[in-house]
Amino acid sequence: MVRTRVLFCLFISFFATVQSSATLISTSCISQAALYQFGCSSKSKSCYCKNINWLGSVTACAYENSKSNKTLDSALMKLASQCSSIKVYTLEDMKNIYLNASNYLRAPEKSDKKTVVSQPLMANETAYHYYYEENYGIHLNLMRSQWCAWGLVFFWVAVLTAATILNILKRVFGKNIMANSVKKSLIYPSVYKDYNERTFYLWKRLPFNFTTRGKGLVVLIFVILTILSLSFGHNIKLPHPYDRPRWRRSMAFVSRRADLMAIALFPVVYLFGIRNNPFIPITGLSFSTFNFYHKWSAYVCFMLAVVHSIVMTASGVKRGVFQSLVRKFYFRWGIVATILMSIIIFQSEKVFRNRGYEIFLLIHKAMNIMFIIAMYYHCHTLGWMGWIWSMAGILCFDRFCRIVRIIMNGGLKTATLSTTDDSNVIKISVKKPKFFKYQVGAFAYMYFLSPKSAWFYSFQSHPFTVLSERHRDPNNPDQLTMYVKANKGITRVLLSKVLSAPNHTVDCKIFLEGPYGVTVPHIAKLKRNLVGVAAGLGVAAIYPHFVECLRLPSTDQLQHKFYWIVNDLSHLKWFENELQWLKEKSCEVSVIYTGSSVEDTNSDESTKGFDDKEESEITVECLNKRPDLKELVRSEIKLSELENNNITFYSCGPATFNDDFRNAVVQGIDSSLKIDVELEEESFTW
């Protein structure tokens, strides 16, 4: 196998070398032949391709300067390709042209530059080698540009490889090689204060979104790599036969490199932004992390496209040929593609998404399809079409996988929606599809189909965390359960329908697309204390992690705690069974009530179910304010250290809660700790 790979690599290298040499030979032969008068104007390709003396001269040049038969054949076919739009020449045709010309070849003379040549000429070796050296410089720059373009792609390959290794070490072998000091200073803290999911407003007007230092460092290295790749290796010897001023050649090189680097990022941008990203399961990185990298790859790609466009425009204006460039088909489509990209980037900002997500989604999808079409027409005469087809392929792959998931889940299904009088939480139950494989952290998208709702609601899909599985819920053994908090849009419409229905229960037709979020299964034995801290509906995301971990071996020797922070005790009604299950698994469960008062009927009814069961009693602590998360984290770390057990915190809740809890964990990690502290954060913010 190793020998086969080596031979394959050698073949590819040899083939690339042959093709590069053939391109240089054919281009240089054409350039030196252009010094002489063959009775054709400089722009009349049809005249040259039908002129037997010109064809004989360039084929003779290729024969004289090719060092191998393979290089010769490739060079002859490169020459033939120059005439493919006028007349199709086969390799045999080109060889016959040379054989005929070899009977009449003569050395070129000075008069041949002004007087029409009547027979084929031998190559002007001085001119040929001059053009070869200059063309080699252009070719070398092109190769460097391709290396730089691939370098950006392989940067992300390296990032994903590192994430995959860490994920497998952790979940399969139970090894966490990340030191506490690295987590405290790099992985967990935000770039700016404790802002991560929340939006920071400068002067209360300008919105800024910050990420963690770890993800920020990855993006910073990516940006620096891009700048460095764009900045080196643009020099060329002067005088140059095509662009004599240095500025013109330098601008051409910068434009070409920016162009190739931007195009190489197209598949990265599209792959990181789709739902069916194949790297999510193996790397363990969340959809929100890939979405962050998707945005920054798009930003960098856009800036490279802007550099390419500005340089091309400035060069055209300075040379006085801008008007003629605008009349060219590929140039106009390049302008269209740049405009489309700028619109996509601008309207994708969080401030616009939050104001009207439906409008954002419609524009984003339409513009992406239009962008692919624009890039096709921009590049189909220039080359590099593989990158363009990759975008279309990734987009089609994602749509195909979505349709397949819906079909595998049974197509049109009926979901039961229910709630209580005083709750804005909707419980969605749907029969578990045969091929739906549940795994902790899994979520699914739902399309709600209703002729009475706005038409665009049926085209929207909303992600919900899947809570239950077949062998966990004895009351609904074949049901998938999801909890949804009604905010605005379709969820608010659904809540209104449920509340107005008898018994607050209604059936709804849906398409179920999933599961997503499935990753490498947790195989290693559990040797850590687990502390889950959820706020509000975040309990639905944290609970499945405890279900998975509490079923693993060696849990009896460890201490696990589950905190649920609520501002409405009526929430306990719809999550009572799950909390009782945790108690049965020897997990300490505490409900922290942050509301202003519990002296009401609803509150009494909410807690009554827990007080009746003495053996499975759940603590309800009424703080009437937000808990001190820093103190909670410090106390749990201290207890784990006394037991000499590593500890993992699971957290999920609103953006403010997640940021506060993340900051609390950062503050709680101390360099003197002898145990490993880890944070697993689930987020509703993408």
UniProtKB/Swiss-Prot annotation:
Record keywords: Cell membrane, Copper, Copper transport, Electron transport, FAD, Flavoprotein, Glycoprotein, Heme, Ion transport, Iron, Iron transport, Membrane, Metal-binding, NADP, Oxidoreductase, Signal, Transmembrane, Transmembrane helix, Transport
FAD-binding FR-type domain residues: 399-522
Catalyzed reactions: 2 a Fe(II)-siderophore + NADP(+) + H(+) = 2 a Fe(III)-siderophore + NADPH
Upregulation: Expression is repressed by the addition of iron. Induced by transcription factor MAC1 upon copper deprivation. Induced by transcription factor AFT1 upon iron deprivation.
Transmembrane spans: 149-169, 216-236, 260-280, 297-317, 329-349, 359-378, 384-401
Residue ranges annotated for the Ferric oxidoreductase domain, each copy included: 258-398
Entry membrane topology: Multi-pass membrane protein
Residues annotated to bind heme 1: 294, 364
Regulation of activity: Inhibited by nitric oxide (NO).
InterPro entries assigned to the protein according to its UniProt record, in alphabetical order: FAD-bd_8 (IPR013112), FAD-bd_FR_type (IPR017927), Fe3_Rdtase_TM_dom (IPR013130), Fe_red_NAD-bd_6 (IPR013121), Ferric/Cupric_Reductase (IPR051410), FNR_nucleotide-bd (IPR039261)
Extracellular-side segments: 23-148, 237-259, 318-328, 379-383
Known cofactor(s): FAD; heme
Annotated GO CC locations: plasma membrane
Cytoplasmic side: 170-215, 281-296, 350-358, 402-686
Biotechnology: Responsible for the reduction of the azo bond of azo dyes, making yeasts efficient azo dye decolorizers.
Enzyme class name: oxidoreductase
Keyword Ion transport (UniProt): yes
GO biological process: copper ion import; intracellular iron ion homeostasis; iron ion transport
Homology family: Belongs to the ferric reductase (FRE) family.
Protein name: Ferric/cupric reductase transmembrane component 1
UniProt source species: Saccharomyces cerevisiae (strain ATCC 204508 / S288c)
